[in-house]
């Protein structure tokens, strides 16, 4: 059940659009901060922005060690450790944030260098983040999985 929905009532009181918009703005700012933490290499600050039971979901691709669902801060920390071991970010461009209710969609473009193969892959992406009580509870990535998989394959 959503606590805030446009035009809905909660406990007999009308919930105004201003309150929804304010929550959406705060959620967007939180998401912007985690991207800033990632850019700065401050993974502990990024992890502090996540709920204890966060779900971090990336596509499962054969031969790509950073695919799958990572549950909880500890596993997400392991995800970022593995990510750093196997790839290096060459570009991260955030183009737009779209917020509605408890979700923020980050749209952008990135380029990665895969250390084992020497290949660079790049893609536009959409990241869907869910926010509750000032923490990220879910991250879902949509990207060019063919380009990602190809970059990890030798040859």
What residues fall within each predicted segment?
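Residues at secondary-structure transition points
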Residues: 22-25, 67-74, 120
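Short glycine-rich loop/turn motifs that provide flexible caps or phosphate-binding loops at active sites
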Residues: 40, 71, 117
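Short, mixed-charge, low-aromatic patches
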Residues: 31-41, 64-67, 83-87, 107-109
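A solvent-exposed, acidic/Ser-Thr-rich amphipathic alpha-helical stretch
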Residues: 45, 51-102
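Short, low-complexity N-terminal intrinsically disordered segments enriched in polar/charged residues
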Residues: 2-52, 153-155
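Hydrophobic pocket/interface hotspot
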Residues: 31-34, 46-47, 54, 72, ...
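A beta-strand edge to alpha-helix "cap/lid" segment located at domain peripheries
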Residues: 7, 11-23, 81-155
């Amino acid at each position: 059940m959503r606590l805030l929905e446009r035009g809905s009532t909660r406990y007999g009181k009308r919930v105004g659009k201003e309150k929804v918009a304010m929550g959406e703005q705060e959620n967007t700012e939180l998401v912007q901060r985690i991207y800033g933490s990632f850019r700065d290499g401050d993974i502990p600050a990024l992890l502090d922005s996540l709920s204890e039971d966060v779900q971090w979901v990336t596509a499962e691709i054969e031969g790509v060690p950073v695919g799958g669902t990572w549950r909880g801060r500890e596993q997400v920390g392991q995800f970022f450790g593995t990510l750093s071991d196997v790839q290096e970010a060459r570009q991260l461009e955030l183009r737009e944030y779209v917020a509605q209710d408890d979700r923020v969609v980050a749209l952008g473009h990135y380029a990665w260098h895969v250390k084992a193969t020497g290949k660079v892959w790049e893609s536009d992406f959409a990241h869907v983040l869910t926010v509750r009580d000032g923490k990220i509870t879910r991250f879902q990535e949509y990207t060019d999985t063919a380009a990602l998989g190809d970059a990890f394959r030798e040859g």
